[in-house]
Amino acid sequence: MKKIVSLVLLATLHAAAAAASSSATPNVPATLAKTEALAALPGGAWLALDKNALRLVGADGSERARLAVRAEGLDLRPIDGGVLAIVMDSNTERVQPVRVDLAAGVLKALPPMPEAGFGLEAACMYRDAQGLDHVFMVGPDGQAQQWLLGTEYRLVRRLALPTAVTHCRVDDAHDTLFVAEEGMGLWAFGANAEGPSARVPVALRAPYGKLAGEIEGLAVLPGGVAALDENGDLLTWRRAGASWTALPKRALGGKQLVALGGAALMVNTKQGWQAPALAWKAGTPAPRALPIVMPRMQTEPVAQLGDAADDPAIWVNPKDATQSRILGTNKKQGMLVYDLQGRETQFLPAGRLNNVDVRQDLRFGDERFDLAVATQRDENSMVLFTIDAKGQLAEAARLPTGLHDIYGTCTYRTAAGGLDAFVNDKDGRYEHWQITRAGGKFGAKLARQFKVATQPEGCVADDRSGLLFVGEEDKALWVTSAKADQPATLKMVMTVGEWLHDDIEGMGIYHGAKHSYLVVSSQGNSSYVVFDAAPPFKVRGAFRVGMDPVAGIDGASETDGLEVSSANFGGPYARGMLVVHDGFKRMPDAAQNYKAVAWDDIAKALKLED
């Protein structure tokens, strides 16, 4: 474990408003003058890390509790009745969680976290939007892991960080992991595991930036971050959208930095502890908090790593809905079929299938079919699959289209019981095909063509109203008629902005007893927006799919396709289910899969009526 000097502590436990409005230095007892790491606690108490012990110290300087440990690095988050803290045990190279009971004056060592498999250079905590606590363990050569705290420690993901990290801290409100890299500077990474760990430079050393020296400590500010450099100067940066603005540095000769909550800091200098008045103006505010619903089930991962899974569909067993099937495309392999427990029941090697949609009880003369239609990207064709009474699929036809780079599809059951299919091209073109059957074979007749300005993918047809919803990925959600004898005049429902964050992806329609809802994947912020499916298409809200640590199911993010059904599938799905593609399979890392959410959970979160 690398020695960490002047480690920065995030102790956001004093009342933020009070701390931000006052520059008075808290009374630091003389007994804490030489402590290696310090955190301010409610009621004037302190948590101090010395060379051989973690100590709980009262406002009067008296020691209330001591935990013998040779450790470095201290971080914490508030909990009922106290705080949850972590330190890095120098003897075992493991993270040691500690529960601090302020009323009883007790430090309780919790079970140590598992070995990371590398020496620890830094560790920091993160509290996500669900209120779940995580720990980032950072080692040499860019090795890092994210773990979930709780009654059972779970590895959430492995991630690559810079090769020589000395400090880390997390801005919970913005889901941002800050890491200081020796010889390079300060970086910001995404802390939310449900997404890519792309990095953004905050401040870099020459020749890449203007940072003058090494960073010796970090503290999170509202919409910003502060640091001490090797000269003891206080540095601050304000968040400005996706970039960072450096503010004038202050020469304080600081040796240690403590965050007091809000925009209040405390710096240990040769003249003693100071609380510099920052006159801080918060940077870009945190995104709007959305309700979080937990998945009830996840499918087995697809066989290929990378961007493989894409779009689900649901086949409802008319005799026993609990025996229904979930179809899912694998863009590198073919069609997958799952039961409602997420177990794979069938695989059809149909090639690079992108989107799929299902319609049931279709009428072709005296014949009745349940059919799935998928887009085949190598052939620019539609692949038709029949579905038998047990949910078994069989390829029935490959129908050519006039598209050059086929992408998405959705289907429409006409009032007469026929099947229409809409397919689109990356150049914005849509083709509307009427599926035919003659001589025991399926065919297709081109009925209409229309176009959006830029790349589309997701679409959904409402069999009841005859409306077709079309997503233009980077631009807007549109609506037109799904009927072949009507003009395809596009009317805008909503542009990308407050609710929809590009890309606009999967879509599905939920038919309740009295209300129908359109669900749209807002891929850019990993959320799902719910609209009324009838004009004026009022927004009913948005939600995210979080993780269920007890069941061991991670959340869903960067969703491509989705499907929703109001059928009674039994158990938690009595009011139906939503199935979504998960772009990042975590806890642990694996190939992509699909998640199922009970509609009842969504309805309760957004207060939706049936």
Where on the chain are the PLM-derived regions?
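Sequence/structural signature of beta-propeller domains
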Residues: 20-610
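Gram-negative bacterial Sec-dependent N-terminal signal peptides
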Residues: 1-20
